[in-house]
Amino acid sequence: MNIKSLKKGCCIALAVYIVLALAFYWIGGDQLHYRDVETDMLSAGAPIGEITKDTVITQQIEVEGGQLTGLTLIGATYARQNTGTLKVEVLDGETVLAEQSVDIAAMADSSEFDIAFDPIVSIPSDKAELKIAAPESVEGNAVTLYVGNSMSTARNQVEVNLSDEEHAYMNGVMQDGALCVQVHSRENLWFGAYYWYIALAGLLAVALYCMYL
């Protein structure tokens, strides 16, 4: 094979490399930059009690990747139509990072409901505190949330050992379990952040090889 043919082959290789790099980035899309994470939810054990205007529920949560996108909780209405607002705050120490409100009237009995955060909430230490209250609710017109201390497997229920900080607290009193909550978060991937640097390094390597033929 003569030099002319080699150079022609190198030009083709460079063109193919560029096309493949662009195609891989386009096909990979957001999956190159981050992955979505969901924690396992505890099985519903018992309701924590009516959440009235005199009630504050707190619990620590772990946010893998440090970016909170949403929560899924299990609520109950006591088989009645209630009104008011469930106020959900995400705190880092005394700092409120995010706040969302849930329309109590729209909640279904003994069912999951979702809370989305837009924009995504950045959690500095990958841990945060949930603070839940219902400032308008009174006894007989309030909802509740489920707590649990076990998790369902393929064959049976497995008890989960919870530390004190992992338990739910109602008005500062530790409850027998943690909130049945699924934490939705996002973890940034280094590959996506440095993809074009990696692609450029590969392109330069191919170009240098061709130059020294």
Regions found by a protein language model. Give the residues of each.
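Beta-sheet-rich sandwich/jelly-roll-like modules and their strand-loop junctions
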Residues: 2-92, 105-114, 119-125, 134-210
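Surface-exposed loop/edge segments in extracytoplasmic proteins
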Residues: 94-102
